Amino acid sequence: MIKWLSEESRETAVYDTILATLADGRHGKLNDMYAHTGFSRAKISVYLKNLMELELVEKVLPGTYEICNAFVRFYFCFLFPHQTSERTEGSAFYEKYIREEYNDFQLLTYRRICQEVLQGRFRTVELWNSRQGKIYFLCREDTGRKIVVDYSGTVCYTSKDYDVLQASMKWEYMTADSILIFSENGYEKTLTEGTVQILVHSVDENS
């Protein structure tokens, strides 16, 4: 990975630092990268532009960036920070450095799968970064109907997940014609008793 990146760009160490900062998914904002790396905002912006041209990074929200290549993100999330351990600990490496964090790592990939499904069904699909710190999708149909989409309940969507969504919408005075939920293993049946229509879509559905 480092060899390939060095062939495509100069100052590999700077790129490595920026990619490692982005890899955990918590420092994607420009100000966070500035605080985390110590590089100037102007320098970070230049390197981000180059990484986007290489199709390694993309801007997902105003001022917010993510690694869009899953292999690159895996490398900088799990392997790059522990290169010495990678060579010396063998099979124990996974148990020590990957297993507990892997579900969080998968969530971004899960979101991208959901986004691809939505882009095939709706006229527009945008990300909404709520003030509660959760990210949702905002979609519109050709008729103008607005759909709020929650992909966060990847195991089983619960009433707690729904309450967080409702609080986020209320805080920002947002309304929706329908709410769409992505979930791997269903949802609490009591959720269908509300006044808002809730649709459930598993990522393995073809419809």
What residue spans do the PLM features occupy?
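Domain-level recognition of nuclease-like catalytic cores that cleave nucleotide substrates
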Residues: 177-207
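Glycine-rich loops and low-complexity Gly/Arg-rich segments
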Residues: 83-84, 90-93, 172-175, 203-206
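Catalytic centers of nucleases
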Residues: 109-170, 188-190, 207
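Hydrophobic beta-strand segments of well-ordered beta-sheets in folded domains
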Residues: 145-148, 175-181
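Surface-exposed beta-strand edges and their flanking turn/coil or helix-capping segments
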Residues: 79-82, 160-164, 194
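Short, surface-exposed connector motifs at secondary-structure boundaries
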Residues: 26-29, 172-176
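Active-site proximal loops enriched in glycine and acidic residues that flank catalytic Cys/His/Asp
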Residues: 48, 61, 141, 149-153, ...
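Accessory nucleic acid-recognition modules appended to NTPase machines
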Residues: 1-133
